[in-house]
Structure formats: C-alpha cells, structure tokens
Amino acid sequence: MSTIDDLPPLREVIQRHDLSARKSLGQNFLLDLNLTTRIARAAGPLEDSTVIEVGPGPGGLTRALLALGAKRVIAIERDERALGALAEISAHYPGRLDIVCADAMTYDPRPLLGGARAKIVANLPYNIATPLLIGWLETDPWPPWYDCLVLMFQREVAERIVATEDDEAYGRLGVLANWRAQTKMLFDISPAAFVPPPKVTSSVVRLIPRDEPEPCNRRMLEQVTAAAFGQRRKMLRQSLKSLGVDPARLAAAAGVEPTRRAETIPVAGFVAMARELANIRGIKSEC
C-alpha cells in the first residue's frame, strides 16, 4: 500500500492496467508519491477547492490531491487505458473525482465549475504543456476562471516562463506570463523519478493570476513581442519595423529607448509599447 492512502502502489497499477507510457502522448509517469504530494501542497489549502488536473495517467498526483483534502478533482485524460485506474481512485474517494476522457487542448472544463474558480495542478504532457499554458494565460475576460496554476514543465520551458529582462531565457513567453501572473520556480525533479525517465530535468512552476495586470490590448502585446524577439539581437528601432509604424517614435512615445534590445526591456516596457501601438491603430487598449 502507498504512504498517502491504502490504494495499491502505482507500479502495480501500471502493470495491472497495461499503462506503458506512450511517447506519442508525451507521457512520463511520476511514481514517487512524496513528490506528487509536494506538487499538490504547492497549490495551497485544497479543502474548499476544485482542482483541474490534465493528464493524470495512473493517478499519482490525483491521489495526492484527494488525500490532501481537495473538495473535487476534475481529471482530464485522453488515454482511455488510464480510465480503469482512475475509476479505482474515484471509488476510493466517492463523489470527489470526475473523470473526463477528452483532449485537454480542445476541452473546456468551465461548464463543470458552475461559475466557481478552480486551481489547475498538473504534470503536463511535455508535447502540449506550452500551448496549454499560453491558452490559459490568454483567457479573456480577466481575471480568469482559475486562481492558481501549479504545473510541471521541462526545465528549459520553466526557465522561459519565470524569466525577466536580462535573463538569457527571457522572451515572448516570459512577457506574457509575468504580465498576467506572478510566477515562481518551485523545485526540480530528476529524470529518475519518472517512468520512463525523460532525457531532461523537470521543474514545477507556480503562477498566481494578477487581478489587474497593466492594461493593454493582448493582441497588440503579442505583435510587439513577436517583432522585438523575432530579431532579439537588433535594436528596437530596427526590430519593430515589421509593425508598419515608425519604430523609433513608437518606442520613444512609450518611454523606451529605441536603441535598446528586446532582452533588456521589462514587461512594463512592452506593455507601454503595446498601448502606444493600439493608440496609433485606434484600438482599445483595455484587455
């Protein structure tokens, strides 16, 4: 039996349900229940919370969330082979686990929430982790339907999420993430903790949505960061030419020196340039 509940060990569950990880689904199962518990705890108190989990697989993190008292867990799993293992967990925690067999890239869990906000806690499949996060960060209207994200990524991606100006990993993802949320790298997880072990170290990141991010039009922000980081080694007066406006005037009007490079501009600078671009184009700046 496990250390967090009296359900069978995860290795036994995987063997009984023939849950060999599939590379095509980006699966790497985390079997150490001490680590899954640590991830679940990072989301804060769970007793009054509904938690969305993406890609539960054999249910290691699912079990940790429920054992720590999550009021309700909605597990979104594309792999039908895992449904039997998840059903066993549901029987052990009656009325607290909803299992949804769907592709998280297209499935919208909000109708299940009844207007309440949720936490999203997941060991995300590597092959969909970044687009899922971007989709959640681009949620409109804002504040979003979730109040906390605790997610596992490849360390390289995690570094991009939490990066700020002058960091080597700073780019479009860091601007979007830190504009709309407070981000923090929590801890690393060795490849040896997974079955099969990935080739890279994984990292757990927590994002807390900002109630009121600096106002700007999100699409204008995307265009500014795409232009600036698309030629990140060039000065803004050159890299922003693709926007179809005078780049030096755009930057200067936003209070940003046109001779600076994208990697040195803080999030507030990009937001200011996005607002100025929206003004030039006659587009509403509020997000």
From Swiss-Prot:
Enzyme Commission identifier(s): 2.1.1.182
InterPro entries cross-referenced by the UniProt entry: KsgA/Erm, rRNA_Ade_diMease-like_C, rRNA_Ade_Mease_Trfase_CS, rRNA_Ade_methylase_Trfase_N, rRNA_adenine_dimethylase, SAM-dependent_MTases_sf
Main localization of the protein described in the UniProt heading: cytoplasm
Gene3D superfamilies, sorted: Ribosomal RNA adenine dimethylase-like, domain 2, Vaccinia Virus protein VP39
Binding sites annotated in the UniProt record for S-adenosyl-L-methionine: N28, L30, G55, E77, D103, N123
Catalytic activity as recorded in UniProt: adenosine(1518)/adenosine(1519) in 16S rRNA + 4 S-adenosyl-L-methionine = N(6)-dimethyladenosine(1518)/N(6)-dimethyladenosine(1519) in 16S rRNA + 4 S-adenosyl-L-homocysteine + 4 H(+)
Gene Ontology cellular component terms for the protein in this record: cytosol
GO molecular function, one term: 16S rRNA (adenine(1518)-N(6)/adenine(1519)-N(6))-dimethyltransferase activity
Sorted UniProt keywords: Cytoplasm, Methyltransferase, RNA-binding, rRNA processing, S-adenosyl-L-methionine, Transferase
Compartment annotation: Cytoplasm
Pfam families reported in the protein's UniProt record: RrnaAD
Protein family: Belongs to the class I-like SAM-binding methyltransferase superfamily. rRNA adenine N(6)-methyltransferase family. RsmA subfamily.
Chain's role: Specifically dimethylates two adjacent adenosines (A1518 and A1519) in the loop of a conserved hairpin near the 3'-end of 16S rRNA in the 30S particle. May play a critical role in biogenesis of 30S subunits.
Matching NCBIfam families: ksgA
Name used for this protein in its record: Ribosomal RNA small subunit methyltransferase A
Organism: Rhodopseudomonas palustris (strain BisA53)
Originating gene: rsmA
